[in-house]
């Protein structure tokens, strides 16, 4: 048994959790977890304001950790390690969580594990589904990232596709802003889409059918803006048509990845905040079945940013003997596949 404290503060959720990992079997349970959302603070701005986010993390993180430890019925001395997000993300928020983790690790003389936030998402399906084995094909979809990767093990990622412009979650958020649906945009668009006709508005599917492995959503976002300005269609129809077009793009790229991935993939896995979208899950399930695979997706509460996934990634790393020095640096950019070539149009490693 290993008790891991997970700390997450990379964007606009402050989170802490205690994970109980059952040693070499790597089955785990969430002993306690808490999440504080900053939605109300950022809603007037239509998106996340980094300074507001960092201040909010600093205000609530320490008392939250004390509360989570109390919920778990343990003290700092009972922990086996402390895992904190070290990037990528908004650097102010990342540093709040990482510095807090370092201080606790030093005070309690416990190992520190600096976790890549994206690896937290990538490994979270194994927390929800212990039978999931490496290697698997991962679709990682969130507000800042849209990637397809082969996951061969902890720290072993091969990127097959990424976005050349907007991430999928960013496209959802911008569509919500265009339609006046507020923040956070993803859930708002999904709710409104249920009331609309997904075939009502003829929106483009960028790069679909081209054989291009990478994603592009900027043109779709622009088409949504033109549809709104035209005033011909209602917001529900625009939302439904956007969601269907976005899903069609994702299915097209994921199909390409399934056909070009290394042999032996055990499952198609989806993770990240947008993985909570029910329509996307349904489409991916059908795609996985057509390729003789099962779809593995965490429950919605583990799709959005949380500390349980950080604690779990820490548990997986600790089981392999991976720990970090107390002077480990925060990283605003931290690709899972550090050997991946720069992407055309993006200008950076995504």
Swiss-Prot record:
Q: Which UniProt keywords apply?
A: Acyltransferase, Cytoplasm, Iron, Metal-binding, Transferase, tRNA processing
NCBIfam families according to UniProt: gcp_kae1, T6A_TsaD_YgjD
Give GO BP annotations, semicolon-separated. tRNA threonylcarbamoyladenosine modification
**InterPro entries found in the cross-reference section:** ATPase_NBD (IPR043129), Gcp-like_dom (IPR000905), KAE1/TsaD (IPR017861), TsaD (IPR022450)
Please list every transmembrane segment annotated in the UniProt record, as residue ranges: none
Q: Which cofactor does it need?
A: Fe(2+)
- Please give the family membership noted in the entry: Belongs to the KAE1 / TsaD family.
Name of protein: tRNA N6-adenosine threonylcarbamoyltransferase
């Amino acid at each position: 048994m290993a008790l891991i404290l997970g700390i997450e503060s990379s964007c606009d959720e402050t989170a802490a959790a205690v994970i109980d990992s059952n040693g070499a079997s790597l089955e785990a349970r969430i002993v306690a977890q808490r999440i504080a959302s900053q939605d109300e603070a950022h809603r007037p701005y239509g998106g996340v304001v980094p300074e507001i986010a960092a201040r909010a993390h600093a205000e609530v993180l320490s008392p939250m950790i004390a509360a989570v430890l109390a919920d778990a019925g343990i003290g700092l001395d009972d922990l086996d390690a402390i895992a904190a997000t070290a990037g990528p993300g908004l650097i102010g928020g990342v540093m709040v969580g990482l510095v807090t983790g370092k201080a606790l690790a030093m005070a309690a003389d416990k190992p520190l594990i600096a976790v890549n936030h994206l690896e937290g998402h990538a490994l979270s399906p194994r927390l929800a589904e212990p039978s999931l084995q490496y290697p698997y094909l991962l679709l990682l979809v969130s507000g800042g990232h849209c990637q397809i990767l082969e996951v061969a093990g902890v720290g072993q990622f091969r990127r097959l596709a990424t976005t050349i412009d907007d991430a999928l979650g960013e496209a959802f958020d911008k569509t919500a802003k265009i339609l006046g649906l507020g923040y956070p945009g993803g859930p708002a668009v999904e709710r409104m889409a249920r009331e609309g006709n997904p075939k009502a508005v003829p929106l483009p599917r960028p790069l679909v059918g081209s054989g291009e492995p990478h994603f592009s959503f900027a043109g779709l976002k622009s088409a949504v803006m033109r549809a709104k300005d035209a005033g011909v269609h209602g917001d529900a129809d625009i939302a439904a048509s956007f969601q269907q077009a976005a899903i069609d793009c994702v299915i097209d790229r994921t199909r390409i990845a399934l056909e070009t991935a290394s042999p032996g993939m055990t499952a198609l896995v989806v993770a990240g905040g947008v993985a909570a979208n029910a329509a996307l899950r349904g489409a991916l399930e059908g795609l996985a079945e057509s390729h003789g695979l099962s779809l593995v997706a965490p429950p919605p509460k583990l799709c959005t940013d949380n500390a349980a996934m950080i604690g779990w990634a820490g548990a997986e790393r600790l089981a392999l003997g991976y720990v970090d020095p107390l002077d480990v640096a925060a990283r605003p950019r931290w690709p899972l596949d550090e050997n991946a070539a720069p992407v055309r149009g993006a200008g950076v490693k995504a």
